[in-house]
């Protein structure tokens, strides 16, 4: 049977590993003073802690780009809904005016209010689509 001491990895072996494979936890383990004081003579300088930079692969960037386009397309659907809402508002204005011409001014003011709200929602959806595409 092997003892637990034989399973431990020596600090020299850990230092000789590739920098990309050293994890931040092991880097903090290596930066303890008792391990640095027992450095072999062949290591000329102090132990350099490996820094991991944020790197993305080509596949990950492609997935992010596809997600941007899907999100922007979903936000653009709201612009089409705005167009349908504007058509409904003015269609209802025509029907209401045909039924009761004496309410022309009140119906027109409600139609303008409905148009403004519908157009505002469409512009908001378009703004979100542009934010998804160009700000993220």
Curated annotation (Swiss-Prot):
Localisation: Mitochondrion membrane
InterPro entries referenced in this protein's UniProt entry, alphabetically: ATP_synth_F0_csu, ATP_synth_F0_csu_DDCD_BS, ATP_synth_F0_csu_sf, ATPase_proteolipid_c-like_dom, F/V-ATP_Csub_sf
One Pfam assignment: ATP-synt_C
Subunit and partners: Homooctamer; the c-ring consists of eight c subunits forming a circle, and each subunit adopts a hairpin shape. Component of the ATP synthase complex composed at least of ATP5F1A/subunit alpha, ATP5F1B/subunit beta, ATP5MC1/subunit c (homooctomer), MT-ATP6/subunit a, MT-ATP8/subunit 8, ATP5ME/subunit e, ATP5MF/subunit f, ATP5MG/subunit g, ATP5MK/subunit k, ATP5MJ/subunit j, ATP5F1C/subunit gamma, ATP5F1D/subunit delta, ATP5F1E/subunit epsilon, ATP5PF/subunit F6, ATP5PB/subunit b, ATP5PD/subunit d, ATP5PO/subunit OSCP.
GO annotation terms (biological process): proton motive force-driven ATP synthesis; proton transmembrane transport
Superkingdom of this protein's organism: Eukaryota
Miscellaneous notes: There are three genes which encode the ATP synthase proteolipid and they specify precursors with different import sequences but identical mature proteins.
Gene Ontology molecular function: lipid binding; proton channel activity
Swiss-Prot/TrEMBL catalytic activity: H(+)(in) = H(+)(out)
Protein name: ATP synthase F(0) complex subunit C1, mitochondrial
Modification note: Trimethylated by ATPSCKMT at Lys-104. Methylation is required for proper incorporation of the C subunit into the ATP synthase complex and mitochondrial respiration.
Organelle targeting peptide span: 1-61
Keywords: CF(0), Hydrogen ion transport, Ion transport, Lipid-binding, Membrane, Methylation, Mitochondrion, Transit peptide, Transmembrane, Transmembrane helix, Transport
Membrane topology: Multi-pass membrane protein
Species assigned in the record: Bos taurus (Bovine)
Site (Reversibly protonated during proton transport): 119
Family: Belongs to the ATPase C chain family.
GO cellular component: mitochondrial membrane; mitochondrion; proton-transporting ATP synthase complex; proton-transporting two-sector ATPase complex, proton-transporting domain
HAMAP family: ATP_synth_c_bact
């Amino acid at each position: 049977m092997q003892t637990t001491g034989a399973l431990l990895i020596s600090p020299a072996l850990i230092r000789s590993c590739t920098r990309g494979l050293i994890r931040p936890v092991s880097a903090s383990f290596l930066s303890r003073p008792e391990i640095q004081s027992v450095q072999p003579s062949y290591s000329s300088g102090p132990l350099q802690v490996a820094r991991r930079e944020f790197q993305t692969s080509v596949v990950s960037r492609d997935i992010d780009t596809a997600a941007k386009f899907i999100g922007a397309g979903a936000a653009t659907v709201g612009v089409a809904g705005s167009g349908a809402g504007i058509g409904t508002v003015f269609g209802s204005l025509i029907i209401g005016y045909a039924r009761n011409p004496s309410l022309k001014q009140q119906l027109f003011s409600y139609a303008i209010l409905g148009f403004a709200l519908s157009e505002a929602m469409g512009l908001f959806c378009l703004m979100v689509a542009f934010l998804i595409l160009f700000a993220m």
